[in-house]
Each structure stands twice: as structure tokens, then as C-alpha cells.
Design a protein with these regions (language model features):
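N-terminal "arm"/small-domain region of PLP-dependent enzymes with the aminotransferase-like
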Residues: 6-73, 202
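PLP-dependent enzyme catalytic core of the Aspartate aminotransferase-like
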Residues: 58, 62-66, 70, 93, ...
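Short loop-beta-helix segment that forms the pyridoxal 5′-phosphate
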Residues: 78-84, 92-116
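Conserved PLP-anchoring active-site segment centered on the Schiff-base-forming lysine
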Residues: 117-136
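Active-site phosphate-binding strand-loop segment of PLP-dependent enzymes
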Residues: 150, 154-206
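Active-site PLP attachment segment
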Residues: 218, 224-260
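PLP-dependent aminotransferase class I/II
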Residues: 243-310, 315-318
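Conserved PLP-binding catalytic core of the aspartate aminotransferase-like
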Residues: 297-306, 311-346, 356, 360-361, ...
Length: 395
């Protein structure tokens, strides 16, 4: 039987390669930081989600090691059997405090949080109204649910209102959006979304994966930026980006929603609890962020410095209030060649092109970190200018 399937898989893989869409994994030979080792060469990393520079922070490493010594390596159980330690509840409380919500539930990843939120809450009597550029985990979570589906154009409030009007016959309606859209770096207009939700009696859910720790005056996310605390019903997010970059996800929001997810969310019920070492480091993250805004302030300074100088050099940069800077090249082949040339210059960035982004919207996505020094930013900018001139992107 596998002979036939092997032929089919081989053809499919060949088609992926021929289309230029085959994903190669480049091996990193060091810890994750602003500077990393790739193929025996030191390069500056500008494509990690390590927004606050905490992935290799000594304080997190110490807290993780200490917790593992005290509480063991793994839980070997799901939460509702014997996989809940007091530290799990402490982390859930810390996340609730950070987002100003009533309760929190932990998952192995935000993919699980988004995959496990809709089906327990909604039925075929209800409606999910989702932004067209939402993350794949939201899309997959919606597919697992029987609710009627609507999709509105990215951050388009007129189109969202159209969907809300069409969904008025449904029992419950929920608007779902990323806080920051990962390919463009644009921020959802959450205040306007909440206005429409209140007008048409809908719930609001925001995925804060790329915005928590980054967006807002102190980095507390899109609700802080837009003044919408208390108006959002559900937040999902990850511990794998700004909050240390390891693993773990969460859903935080209204108490009754979280209570029901504990009873019926399948990724929560049937996945092992987060390991104590992850919990220990994550508790340290929220302690650090409660104590000081220093890392967020440094990130904002770095983002503004990079954007201003790249735009002054003549690059087309998408507007953003996040740490994601999309350097627009528009041509798929050019984006691949540009990224390869940047690595030759000692800068690790990635080119994105169709189908990850729309046709003729190819770009280099640059992700800035609080860990980047001014010297490293200058080196990255200089490399962009050099390669840009060599490839006739800049005159």
C-alpha cells in the first residue's frame, strides 16, 4: 500500500520544490539571541520572535533550572488528573494580572489555545466573524467548530459591519482578530472593532501573540494601546515570543468562558501540563515586566531607529506600531535572492512571498528585539543598503 502513497508524496514534494515553496530548515549552532551561529559563522538574527530579548536571559535560565530542581522535569499527566501544581495556578494568575482579566487557562502552545476555544463555546446556531489575515491556528480552530463562518477584509471596518449585519439571525456572534498581523506588522483597530461589537451585540476575541510585550505604552498589548480593557471577552497568546520564547500558550478572559474551557477544551483536557521549568521561567518573565518597562522602552527605541533610517535610505516599509518591519520588495524571486545576499553579509532575515503573502507583495520581514545593540542595528541597515543597491532596489 505504501508504494502508491510514496509515489504520490514524492510527486507532491517535487511540485513544492518546483514552485520554490519547499521550506529548508537552517541549523542554528548556538543559543537564541541577537547574534547566533549558523553554519559555523556568526550572524545577526533579525527574524526571531524574541522581541524583549528574554530567550537567553540569565534570569530566566536560573529560574527555569531552579524550578526543575525543585519540581522535577515533567508532569506526566494532564491538568485534571494529577498535572496541576500550585505554580501552574500562579502563572495563570500572573497572566490574568498582566491582561487585566478574570481568569486564565494554560495550553501547550497558542496553536492549541486557538484550536480549542471555539468548539466548546459555539454551535451551529452561532457565528464566527474572522479577519481575513488571522493566523493559521485561528483558521484551523474555526474549522473545528460548527458555527457559521464569516470573513472580513483585513482591518476593514465596513466589511466587518457587513458581516455583523448578515450574522444577526445567529444566537451568538464573536469577532476574532489578531492583535498584530504577523506579515505586515499592522495593529488591529481594536477600539473600532469593540464599537461594532457593542452595536451588533457580539463578543470580541484577540490573539495577542505578536502584540503582548510589544504594543502599548508599557507593552501590555492592543487593549492598552486602544483603551479597550474590559471590552474584550477573550485573549489568546503565547509564551513563545516576547515572553521568553520557549513554549506554552494561554487563553485569558471572562471567568465563565475560562471555566467552560477547562471542562470541554480538548487540547487542554488531553495534553500534558506545561513542564515546571517552563512555568518557572515564565513566572520570572512576568516578575521582570511588572518591575520595570526597561525592555519594552529599549524595543520601541530600536524599532523607531531602524524604521527611520531604513525609510531615509529609500526602502518601502509598511507602517507599523509593532516590532515587525516589512521591507517591501514585491517580487518573489527578488525576496529570496535578497535574503540570501543578506546572510552573506552576516544578517539572518527571511524573504516571504506567495502563498504566505498575496501575489506581488513579497517582502523581507525584519523583527526587531530589545537585545539588538545600536551597532548591530547599524550593521543590518548598512547591509540592507549595500544589497539594495547591488540588486537595484535602491538607486
Amino acid at each position: 500500500m505504501y508504494g502508491k502513497m510514496k509515489e504520490h508524496l514524492s510527486r507532491t514534494l517535487a511540485e513544492i520544490r518546483e514552485a520554490g515553496l519547499y521550506k529548508e530548515e537552517r541549523l542554528i549552532e548556538s543559543s537564541q539571541y541577537a547574534s547566533i551561529q549558523v553554519a559555523g559563522k556568526e550572524v545577526l538574527n533579525f527574524c526571531a520572535n524574541n522581541y524583549l530579548g528574554l530567550a537567553n536571559d540569565p534570569r530566566l535560565i536560573e529560574a527555569s533550572s531552579k524550578m526543575m530542581q525543585e519540581r522535577g522535569f515533567g508532569m506526566a499527566s494532564v491538568r485534571f488528573i494529577c498535572g496541576t501544581q500550585d505554580i501552574h495556578k500562579q502563572l495563570e494568575a500572573a497572566i490574568s494580572d498582566y491582561f487585566k482579566t478574570e481568569d486564565t487557562i494554560l495550553y501547550a502552545a497558542c496553536f492549541d489555545a486557538n484550536g480549542g476555544v471555539f468548539e466548546p463555546l459555539l454551535t451551529d446556531e452561532d457565528a464566527i466573524i474572522s479577519d481575513a489575515l488571522n493566523h493559521a491556528s485561528i483558521i484551523d480552530g474555526v474549522r473545528l467548530c460548527k458555527a457559521k463562518r464569516y470573513r472580513y477584509a483585513n482591518a476593514d471596518m465596513a466589511d466587518l459591519e457587513r458581516c455583523l449585519q448578515e450574522a444577526q439571525a445567529q444566537r451568538f456572534r464573536i469577532i476574532v482578530t489578531d492583535g498584530v498581523f504577523s506579515m505586515d506588522g499592522n495593529v488591529a483597530p481594536l477600539d473600532k472593532i469593540c464599537d461594532l461589537a457593542e452595536k451588533y451585540d457580539a463578543l470580541v476575541m484577540v490573539d495577542e501573540s505578536h502584540s503582548a510585550g510589544v504594543v502599548g505604552e508599557t507593552g501590555h498589548g492592543v487593549s492598552e494601546l486602544t483603551g479597550t480593557y474590559g471590552r474584550v471577552d477573550i485573549y489568546t497568546g503565547t509564551l513563545g515570543k516576547a515572553f521568553g520564547g520557549a513554549m506554552g500558550g494561554f487563553t485569558t478572559g471572562r471567568k465563565e468562558i475560562i471555566d467552560l474551557l477547562r471542562q470541554r477544551s480538548r487540547p487542554y483536557l488531553f495534553s500534558n501540563s506545561l513542564a515546571p521549568c517552563i512555568i518557572g521561567a515564565s513566572l520570572e518573565v512576568f516578575r521582570i515586566l511588572k518591575e520595570s518597562n526597561e525592555l519594552h522602552d529599549k524595543l520601541v527605541e530600536n524599532v523607531n531607529y531602524f524604521r527611520d533610517r531604513m525609510m531615509a535610505a529609500g526602502f518601502d516599509i509598511k507602517p507599523t506600531q509593532s516590532a515587525i518591519c516589512a521591507v517591501m520588495l514585491y517580487d518573489a524571486r527578488l525576496s529570496q535572492v535578497f535574503a540570501a545576499r543578506m546572510q552573506e553579509e552576516g544578517i539572518y532575515v527571511t524573504g516571504f512571498y506567495y502563498p504566505v503573502v498575496p501575489k506581488d507583495q513579497a517582502r523581507i520581514r525584519v523583527q526587531i528585539s530589545a537585545a539588538h545593540t545600536r551597532e548591530q542595528l547599524d550593521k543590518c541597515i548598512a547591509a540592507f543598503i549595500k544589497v539594495g543597491k547591488d540588486l537595484n532596489v535602491l538607486k
